[in-house]
From Swiss-Prot:
Region (Docks into pockets in the proteasome alpha-ring): 587-588
CC per GO annotation: proteasome complex
Biased composition (Basic and acidic residues): 1-10
Protein name (database record): Proteasome-associated ATPase
Source organism phylogeny: Bacteria, Bacillati, Actinomycetota, Actinomycetes, Kitasatosporales
GO MF term set: ATP binding; ATP hydrolysis activity
Coiled coil: 47-94
Domain notes: Consists of three main regions, an N-terminal coiled-coil domain that binds to protein Pup and functions as a docking station, an interdomain involved in ARC hexamerization, and a C-terminal ATPase domain of the AAA type.
Length: 588
């Protein structure tokens, strides 16, 4: 056995070439044992190798991800370096200047204005020279060459246009201290209709004006749109409407007949009367009706007229001459509109606030210059064609007589307080069949809405105009000792009727919400009349008794004493006397 091991150690396989079968068998058994041992160890070795492979693959994936992160970091660093370089280059560039383009030259250069100097510079190929316009802002490089076209200037000083010069490219303007200056018209103003008096935006360094700036102080006072109120929406003033239509519409619609009869159309109309009776409504309806008549005469689908609504008190200005200037601007605009053949209505509301009697001593005497300005505009050297002046006032006695004389405000129309018939007409404008009516009121008239509404109006008017104890308002004492009782009907107005209907509608809504009873009832109207009268109870407290004479139409005798006769809702007499007080209150 020892010999066999020695043979093995020497690399000699025992039994090979030996003729001893037993030795060969032993050798083979040893080989089999070795192979079996190796075969048993092979899976474990394979598993170790596989685990090693997995570990290496994991390490490889981690290294690859790390490489990707490093590559991404390098790319970001490179981008940041490039961006920083660009930022450094950008910050290192010299500043770019701006200038105003004046004109292009035949050699491809351009004349610009910059830094108070007029320069001739080159233009970058990236800028289309033919597309540059006069007054346009351009960007300049350090060599003062044009490298980019910009927008027009949008800020500057406000100047007033005096006139356009003959070349059509320059204008004479007035600054804020009334100094005159000749400026250039920028391209946006070329071809536009600009009028003397318009406010323009001036860039003072280059001397260009760029745009027309709306004049807020005049635009707020003037309403050019035609109101959408028609004569059919006005109740109880049929006679007055016919008079104003004859005065305003006929001269424009039939000018040949007026020339044939050598009849001069009226220049102005005065609407006077108590407040709330429809003076402003009529003036608005005149413009609307005139536009429709123009459409009929010209055959156009939609006629055109202008309604310049002048808010009288807002024209007053603390600076001397400003009010007169604004009046001139108003009539200048009216003449421009009328020169196109379009009728223009200039409406002065609350006319007595502007054109009071001169020398009356009841104001700051600004009317000493305002009234002559209006007179010069109405019938001065520069006449008015296709322009009608309409004034509205509830104190016509305070207007200067020179304005009211024939040839200026030729037609004077008094807007009376509504009588019973007129009140029915006014009620019919606000109380219509479209409104929800209560079933009980409808049942009394066999579900006839028209009959129900007519009955409600009749009942309300009868209560308003009844000379009953509940409707007594004032007892006036005249200077000759006579006394007269005035009722609420003597102070009724269209505005009051509208308010009464509004109160009744609100009562109907509250009844529906509280009692689930839907519809307007006659009781709502009657209660609304009582509430309206009750609210007017205290109005005489701040009124001069002389004003009541003008309101009631009894101007022949002076009122020296007034006593209220209002009966409260609980039946208590709340009558009291009112002595003569200063003329401070609003006029009923």
């Amino acid at each position: 056995m020892a010999a066999h091991d020695d043979d093995m150690n020497r690399g000699i396989r025992p039994g090979r070439g030996s003729e001893d079968p037993a030795g060969q068998v032993a050798y083979l058994e040893q080989e089999i044992a070795v192979l079996r041992r190796k075969l048993a160890e092979s899976p474990r070795h394979t598993r170790i190798l596989e685990e090693r492979i997995v570990e290496l693959q994991t390490n490889l994936a981690g290294v690859s991800a790390q490489n990707e992160r490093l590559a991404g970091t390098l790319r970001e660093a490179r981008d940041q370096i490039v961006a920083l370089k660009e930022e450094v280059d950008r910050l290192a560039q010299p500043p770019a200047g701006f200038g105003v383009f004046l004109q292009a030259n035949e050699d491809g250069t351009a004349d610009i204005f910059t830094g108070g100097r007029k320069l001739r510079v080159n233009v970058s190929p990236s800028v289309e020279l033919d597309e540059l316009r006069r007054g346009q802002e351009v960007m300049l490089n350090e060599a003062l060459n044009v490298v980019e076209a910009m927008e027009y200037e949008s800020v500057g000083d406000i100047v007033t246009l005096k006139e356009i010069l003959e070349d059509g490219e320059r204008a004479l303007v007035l600054g804020h201290t009334d100094e005159e200056r000749v400026v250039r018209l920028a391209e946006p103003l070329r071809g536009l209709t600009i009028r003397p008096g318009d406010a323009l935006l001036l860039e003072p360094r280059s001397g260009y004006v760029y745009e027309v700036v709306p004049k807020s102080e005049v635009e707020e006072l003037v309403l050019e749109e035609v109101p959408d109120i028609g004569y059919e929406q006005i109740g109880g003033l049929g006679g007055q409407i016919e008079m104003i239509r004859d005065a305003v519409e006929l001269p424009y619609l039939y000018p040949d007949l007026f020339r044939e009869h050598e009849l001069r159309p009226p220049k102005g109309v005065l609407l006077y009367g108590p407040p709330g009776c429809g003076k402003t409504l009529i003036a608005k309806a005149v413009a609307n009706s005139l536009a429709k008549k123009v459409a009929e005469v010209t055959g156009q689908a939609a006629g055109k007229s202008f309604f310049l609504n002048i808010k009288g008190p807002e024209l007053l200005n603390k600076y001397v001459g400003e009010t007169e200037r604004q009046i001139r601007l108003v009539f200048q605009r009216a003449r421009e509109k009328a020169s196109e053949g379009t009728p223009v209505i200039v409406f002065f509301d609350e006319m007595e606030s502007l054109f009071r009697t001169r020398g009356s001593g009841v104001s700051s005497d600004v009317e000493n210059t305002i009234v002559p300005q209006l007179l010069a505009e109405i019938d001065g050297v520069e006449g008015l064609q296709n322009v009608v002046v309409i004034g509205a006032s509830n104190r016509e006695d305070m207007i200067d007589p020179a304005i009211l004389r024939p040839g200026r405000l030729d037609v004077k129309i008094k807007i009376e307080r509504p009588d019973a018939e007129a009140a029915k007409d006014i009620f019919g404008k606000y109380l219509t069949e479209r409104l929800p009516l209560h079933s009980d009121d409808l049942a009394e008239h066999e579900k006839d809405k028209s009959a129900t509404v007519s009955s409600m109006i009749q009942t309300a008017v009868e209560q308003m105009y009844a000379e009953s104890e509940e409707n007594r308002f004032l007892e006036v004492t005249y200077a000759n000792g006579d006394k007269e009782v005035l009722y609420f009907k003597d102070f009724n107005s269209g505005a009051m009727i509208e308010n009464i209907v509004g109160r009744a509608k609100k009562m109907a809504i509250k009844d529906f919400l509280d009692k689930n009873q839907k519809g307007l009832r006659v009781s709502h109207l009657l209660q609304a009349c009582v509430d309206e009268f009750k609210e007017n109870e205290d109005l005489p407290n701040t009124t001069n008794p002389d004003d009541w004479a003008r309101i009631s139409g009894k101007k022949g005798e002076r009122i020296v004493y007034i006593r209220t006769l209002v009966t409260g809702k609980q039946g208590a007499d709340t009558g009291r006397s009112i002595d003569t007080v200063a003329n401070t209150g609003q006029y009923l």
